[in-house]
């Protein structure tokens, strides 16, 4: 466990060094399969003096070209209410980045990436993705999609005449990524695996 604590604090230094932004953008881009440009950090309870402080984590906020926000967190001490804290963190960012008089379409899309170095629930895999899906109770294969007008207004999609958007209503809602680093115990087969291996062992192959 001592190795992970050292690496957690090394990541804190990495996050706060603007010269290393490309490294983190590479990790985020690999995970989400799209380009993100880091714009600013979230300064919160992450500035602790001890590895065992209550909020032992690394937080920063990144923004892409579309104005979407991403929260990045590292946690190496077990916490029973971790899922609740993730939910709170996303909710807080949503409310922090909208003004009182703004219309609801100004609510930002938020991604939450969480790297954990402890057993989380009954996890067997090492990467989990969570998102909101609206499906019909009477027609479970019917996934609720946006209208063409909503798709254009919210995502800037250009839809040809006669076509319907493939955007789901759930695409408006936050998405969550959980990287259970300790569950990774195999050879890296793709770029994402190489990142997980790096997060676990601190070595670049």
What are these regions (language model features)?
Residues 1-205:
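Elongated, amphipathic alpha-helical interaction scaffolds
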């Amino acid at each position: 466990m001592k190795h992970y604590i050292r690496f957690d604090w090394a990541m804190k230094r990495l996050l706060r060094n603007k010269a290393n932004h490309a490294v983190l953008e590479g990790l985020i881009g690999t995970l989400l399969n799209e380009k993100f440009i880091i714009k600013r950090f979230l300064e919160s309870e992450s500035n602790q003096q001890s590895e065992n402080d209550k909020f032992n984590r690394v937080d920063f906020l990144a923004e892409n070209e579309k104005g979407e926000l991403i929260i990045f967190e590292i946690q190496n001490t077990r916490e029973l209410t971790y899922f609740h804290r993730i939910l709170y963190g996303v909710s807080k960012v949503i409310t922090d980045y909208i003004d009182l008089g703004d219309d609801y379409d100004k609510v930002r899309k938020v991604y939450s990436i969480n790297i954990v170095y402890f057993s989380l629930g009954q996890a067997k895999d090492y990467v989990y993705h969570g998102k909101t899906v609206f499906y019909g109770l009477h027609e479970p294969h019917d996934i609720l999609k946006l209208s063409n007008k909503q798709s254009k207004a919210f995502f800037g999609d250009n839809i040809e005449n006669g076509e319907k958007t493939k955007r789901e209503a759930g695409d408006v809602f936050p998405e969550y990524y959980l990287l259970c680093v300790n569950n990774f115990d195999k050879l890296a087969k793709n770029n994402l695996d190489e990142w997980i291996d790096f997060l676990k062992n601190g070595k670049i192959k």
